Amino acid sequence: MFRSFMLAFQKACRQVHKQYLNKYYSVITYFLAFLTKFAILLESFTPFVSTPPLTSTPITPFNLSASPTFSGVSPPANIKCKLSGLSCLPTQSEIEFQSKSSPVPPASESNKGINE
């Protein structure tokens, strides 16, 4: 209702603006800008005009927060290594124990019958 009144009033002001374009250009332009900003300001305080109530959902069916830990998995109790400066390095016996042969791939369901 108020918006239709404002549009009609602005249309009338534009007609007046055309008649007095040279003499009162800045005053009429300022007044039209003031009326437009005032109409926008009044509509911004009108409830349910800018945001319909259906767009905001206070209760959602999904829990979007992350779980604190993985289920059934916990971190190790301690890390067994010797600290050398800032890095955790393996001991000399662990380095010498490493195998020089190539690794054997794990058995899968597809090749179980072949190896038996």
Swiss-Prot record:
Region called Disordered, residue ranges: 95-116
An annotated GO cellular component of this protein is: membrane
Give the way it sits in the membrane. Answer: Single-pass membrane protein
Give a yes or no for keyword Transmembrane helix in this entry. Answer: yes
| Keywords linked to the UniProt accession | Membrane, Transmembrane, Transmembrane helix
Further remarks about this protein from its record: Partially overlaps TRP1.
Name the record gives this protein: Putative uncharacterized protein YDR008C
Q: Which organism is it from?
A: Saccharomyces cerevisiae (strain ATCC 204508 / S288c)
